[in-house]
Amino acid sequence: MVNLELVLNAPEYYEVIRELRTDPKNLHGFVEQVSITPEQQKNYMDKFGNDYQICLRNGEPVGFVGVVDKDIRFAVNPNYHGQGIGKFMISKLVEQNRDVLAKVMVDNVASKKVFESCGFKLYKLDENFLYFSL
């Protein structure tokens, strides 16, 4: 049986977040497509780490979700794409905080589907991004 849970972010997860954030299979989905050093990650987490949660699958970290300036940021280990982990994380996040938005690159079909499946509606569209709210 698969057990998913969200836990509070902690320093031992900073590198997990960085690895998920910079994985080539995930990087294309981020608004800022840049490589992040461990030091840059630590500095960012020192500032925003409390705004993130880690998704554990049977006790192992497989994803993260966070909100910075009302904007949802998330990633799932590519080995677990398509298994509902993104939807699980976004759904749990929305239970905790409905005052959130999502900015998705127009070609990021997977994230678009996740947000729509969690009740988000498109409210704005431009050349590069889709903007969703609840």
Task: Label each residue range with its predicted role.
Residues 64, 123-125:
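Residue-level detector of high-confidence beta-strand sites
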Residues 102-117, 121, 128-129:
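Conserved beta-strand-loop-alpha-helix junction that forms the acyl-donor binding cleft
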Residues 34-37, 63-70:
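A conserved beta-strand-loop-helix scaffold within acyl/acetyltransferase catalytic domains
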Residues 51-63:
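Conserved beta-hairpin
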Residues 1-12:
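Conserved N-terminal entry element of GNAT/NAT acetyltransferase domains
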Residues 82-96, 109-117:
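Conserved acetyl-CoA-binding loop-helix of GNAT-fold acetyltransferases
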Residues 68-85, 104-105:
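A short, internal acetyl-CoA/4′-phosphopantetheine-binding micro-motif in the GNAT/acyltransferase core
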Residues 25-43:
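Conserved GNAT-fold acetyl-CoA-binding loop/helix
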